[in-house]
Amino acid sequence: MSRFFTTGSDSESESSLSGEELVTKPVSGNYGKQPLLLSEDEEDTKRVVRSAKDKRFEELTNLIRTIRNAMKIRDVTKCLEEFELLGKAYGKAKSIVDKEGVPRFYIRILADLEDYLNELWEDKEGKKKMNKNNAKALSTLRQKIRKYNRDFESHITNYKQNPEQSADEDAEKNEEDSEGSSDEDEDEDGVGNTTFLKKKQESSGESRKFHKKMEDDDEDSEDSEDEEWDTSSTSSDSDSEEEEGKQTVLASKFLKKAPTTEEDKKAAEKKREDKAKKKHDRKSKRLDEEEEDNEGGEWERVRGGVPLVKEKPKMFAKGTEITHAVVIKKLNEILQVRGKKGTDRATQIELLQLLVQIAAENNLGVGVIVKIKFNIIASLYDYNPNLATYMKPEMWQMCLDCINELMDTLVAHSNIFVGENILEESENLHNFDQPLRVRGCILTLVERMDEEFTKIMQNTDPHSQEYVEHLKDEAQVCAIIERVQRYLEEKGTTEEICQIYLRRILHTYYKFDYKAHQRQLTPPEGSSKSEQDQAENEGEDSAVLMERLCKYIYAKDRTDRIRTCAILCHIYHHALHSRWYQARDLMLMSHLQDNIQHADPPVQILYNRTMVQLGICAFRQGLTKDAHNALLDIQSSGRAKELLGQGLLLRSLQERNQEQEKVERRRQVPFHLHINLELLECVYLVSAMLLEIPYMAAHESDARRRMISKQFHHQLRVGERQPLLGPPESMREHVVAASKAMKMGDWKTCHSFIINEKMNGKVWDLFPEADKVRTMLVRKIQEESLRTYLFTYSSVYDSISMETLSDMFELDLPTVHSIISKMIINEELMASLDQPTQTVVMHRTEPTAQQNLALQLAEKLGSLVENNERVFDHKQGTYGGYFRDQKDGYRKNEGYMRRGGYRQQQSQTAY
């Protein structure tokens, strides 16, 4: 029991009834303590002695309240901490719970917390936004709550079957608590005593009767209030009579006494009756509302409602004269709310369209109409505040129509000048005697339109029909860009012309011109006159168009970025149409490879795409070394997909946050611009095979030979590690199998692995001139197989006939002669040509296989001797240096020197 109640003598008189100040004297033995003086405020304060059950339950409810607050702010770490404390508090209250039962509020928090954690766990986007501590706490708490709730499965199931009952009890309890607190504030007679004094007091009989009556009157109210919390107005049976007596006697000293007069009794009874009446009225009102809701029988499913006729908003008051000033004022009013929170963007667009109609009906002139249409298009672009969100199809079509209408107006009225440099104060919208001036930039609208088109293509499934439908809109986009190009060529500045030219280039550079390609294959003499006329009417080829646009940018542009993009697109277009030497020369003259690392990421992606296309072009021309060098940087990184802007790698997603991922996804090129990655890898591996296999055969005994392609060697090692080799299936397996055949000089097997139906479908048929590429590949395989054969078996032959080699590799004799001559000149093959007999005579200057092994053994033994000498010096304590390269001796005045692979004994000299 608290020391507060034990202080003082039992014989003190109850002076609180007379209103005198209460002075508590210390008992004997408590000399060090000051007497406790109660002020008047403390005298009036009610003091309540709570049972152990109330204390434990209050501790639980406080923890539950903290958990719910943490759930609202998604603080899972706080939830975990409080849940652990809640479990400990529940353990302390176990004896009370065993007697009274598990409280319903405890079951509710367990069920709600488990549902809340499951929601967070299923929300993948929300989990990504969590910090590290919250994510870790979520996993831990989810496991703990699932394990903890197993002991309360039946209670949680019953609660979930009827959760409304608990909610109604809470609402009713809160209402009664609020009313009860207001009544207690007004009650001057200490009504709360009856809830505290739970046993019969041994004081006056009149007080006991009054308490008994109050308990009977308040029985219904207390039952409803204490139903959930499992509290009652009766005391616990476990309390002893002695403790009860002490509590009641001490409480009677500090609490106000119950009313004793008849007037006080009547007032208290009246208040209780009013409270019971209010409670009854609330229940009856709720029942009436439920009956009203249930009137009319069963519910019926409504198939369709009557469509609401949406009234058009009224722009102007009735009778208002529509003038330029009134319309411009209304336009400014609409634009003032643009971008503000809560603004309905669709309604704003409708208002602007209605304003255009009003301006046209009242003949206010094209100046006002053009100004409003500029704002309509800008509002369409601002409809989606999120940068990653793309336009809806209806909004996109509306945007295209508005831009076309605006261009029709600008082209039809040549006296209208638009530009960003025109201030709103200097606009001329209605004075037709002078040229009309409108603030706005048609180039900005077209660039934004192009960006929206790219965004639509990025966010559409590339394998769906919807993507094809959206791709058809590119014709409209290109037509608008072409119209704006012609308009700006007449009225635009040099900078604007360069920008619109770049837009035109970006929609042209990646397209293969099949018509121009067919015209190149068909000579003019072989085509009919109608075909020639049709070719003339089609306009200039894409090559001529690219040449004209790019040269203008090279000469007029003042910004490095536009010129760089134009050069890269020009190189890409040359490479796509197999103009290798023009593309290579333009790349070398531009020196872009020296400073491309300083460019922004979209330009770097364009550079990577151009280099890849350049490498594929070199491969088609049979220049395997140039193709390999162009593709080396992209393929050796292992991130070709990411470097070409065609997707993000899963392993790299962990290295960036969510914002960086969104930015990089916006940089991805649409699917119709993608370069086939399997074709790219196949071209690289075949080029590496044609270079690496002859090199490996020429330097087979060289332990220090370098690798031309690490990725190709990796594929070879993967193939060698397989214990059981079946027929090749993937593209990589075909290249590895072909490489093994080429090592043996078997060009026919190599050819069958590289060129077959499966490889044709995956790779070779994707080229514009597939037959030409296959013919080139067969020729390269024959030549490199011949080189490999000579390198591998030169030690076997004393001489070999070139005719034999020609028949073996199905090459004509001049080609064989040329290949062998180059090998001899480059000192790759130690041999000579005997012209009269057409034979190759081997000189046998290269060491044989046995000699190579002996040389390797001698080299390894020499390194072993050196290592042993170092270990010996270390044991003898010679830490200062190693003297084998000096003339003095050591270890019995003898030293060892490695010179040319053998040991020489040096003469003894003084050190």
Swiss-Prot record:
Processing and modification events after translation: Phosphorylated. Phosphorylation is enhanced upon serum stimulation.
Alphabetical list of SMART domains matching this protein: PINT
Pfam families: eIF-3c_N, PCI
InterPro entries according to UniProt: EIF3C (IPR027516), EIF3C_N_dom (IPR008905), PCI_dom (IPR000717), WH-like_DNA-bd_sf (IPR036388), WH_DNA-bd_sf (IPR036390)
Compositional bias segments (type: Acidic residues): 166-190, 216-230
Gene Ontology biological process terms, A to Z: formation of cytoplasmic translation initiation complex; translational initiation
Domain PCI intervals: 671-847
Cross-referenced PROSITE patterns: PCI (PS50250)
Keyword Lipoprotein in annotation: no
Modified residues annotated as Phosphothreonine in this record: 522
Comp. bias regions, Low complexity: 8-21
Cell compartment(s), UniProt: Cytoplasm
Polar residues composition bias: residue spans: 520-529
Predominant location: cytoplasm
Binding partners and assembly: Component of the eukaryotic translation initiation factor 3 (eIF-3) complex, which is composed of 13 subunits: EIF3A, EIF3B, EIF3C, EIF3D, EIF3E, EIF3F, EIF3G, EIF3H, EIF3I, EIF3J, EIF3K, EIF3L and EIF3M. The eIF-3 complex appears to include 3 stable modules: module A is composed of EIF3A, EIF3B, EIF3G and EIF3I; module B is composed of EIF3F, EIF3H, and EIF3M; and module C is composed of EIF3C, EIF3D, EIF3E, EIF3K and EIF3L. EIF3C of module C binds EIF3B of module A and EIF3H of module B, thereby linking the three modules. EIF3J is a labile subunit that binds to the eIF-3 complex via EIF3B.
Family: Belongs to the eIF-3 subunit C family.
Protein role: Component of the eukaryotic translation initiation factor 3 (eIF-3) complex, which is required for several steps in the initiation of protein synthesis. The eIF-3 complex associates with the 40S ribosome and facilitates the recruitment of eIF-1, eIF-1A, eIF-2:GTP:methionyl-tRNAi and eIF-5 to form the 43S pre-initiation complex (43S PIC). The eIF-3 complex stimulates mRNA recruitment to the 43S PIC and scanning of the mRNA for AUG recognition.
Protein name: Eukaryotic translation initiation factor 3 subunit C
The organism of origin for this protein: Mus musculus (Mouse)
